[in-house]
């Protein structure tokens, strides 16, 4: 099982959940039914934990993000970057299995793939601020 790929898929599913009204169970079910590569490559338990964790702690996660934005409001953050932040903040605040530096580094790697260089610095700054508190 590939944790890096699983984290990336979790972010993609979180992004999809921001665009429609499906809950995490429906989203994950649809994903598993339609995944075209070898599903054994993914840690489905981890993906489910991320989706449920973000969904159940969204208000707390968004509050942590909002408190650590400098001259920004959370509704100005692109949906992709917000999903990356939510995943990473969930791991920082609610998932003791993931070391903090791993959560931040993986978030930055996902940002490099799905966003732009300015976003990498922005997300790094927000996550570092959260980690310091």
Curated annotation (Swiss-Prot):
Keyword Cytoplasm: no
GO molecular function terms noted in the UniProt entry: RNA binding
Signal peptide extent: none
GO annotation, cellular component aspect: cytosol
Keywords for the protein's UniProt record, in alphabetical order: RNA-binding, Transcription, Transcription antitermination, Transcription regulation
GO terms classed as biological process: DNA-templated transcription termination; transcription antitermination
SUPFAM superfamilies assigned: NusB-like
Function of the protein: Involved in transcription antitermination. Required for transcription of ribosomal RNA (rRNA) genes. Binds specifically to the boxA antiterminator sequence of the ribosomal RNA (rrn) operons.
PANTHER family from the UniProt entry: ANTITERMINATION NUSB DOMAIN-CONTAINING PROTEIN, N UTILIZATION SUBSTANCE PROTEIN B-RELATED
Family in the record: Belongs to the NusB family.
Designated name of the protein: Transcription antitermination protein NusB
């Amino acid at each position: 099982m590939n944790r890096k790929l699983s984290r990336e898929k979790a972010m993609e599913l979180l992004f999809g959940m921001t665009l429609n009204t499906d809950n995490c169970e429906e989203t994950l079910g649809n994903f598993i039914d339609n995944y075209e590569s070898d599903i054994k490559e993914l840690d489905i338990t981890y993906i489910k934990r991320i989706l449920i964790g973000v969904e159940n702690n969204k208000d707390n996660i968004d509050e942590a993000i909002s408190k650590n934005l400098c001259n920004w409001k959370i509704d100005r953050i692109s949906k992709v970057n917000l999903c990356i932040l939510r995943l990473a903040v969930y791991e920082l605040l609610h998932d003791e299995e993931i070391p903090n530096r791993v959560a931040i580094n993986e978030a930055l790697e996902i940002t490099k793939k799905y966003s732009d260089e300015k976003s990498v610095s922005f997300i790094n700054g927000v996550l570092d601020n959260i980690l310091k508190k």
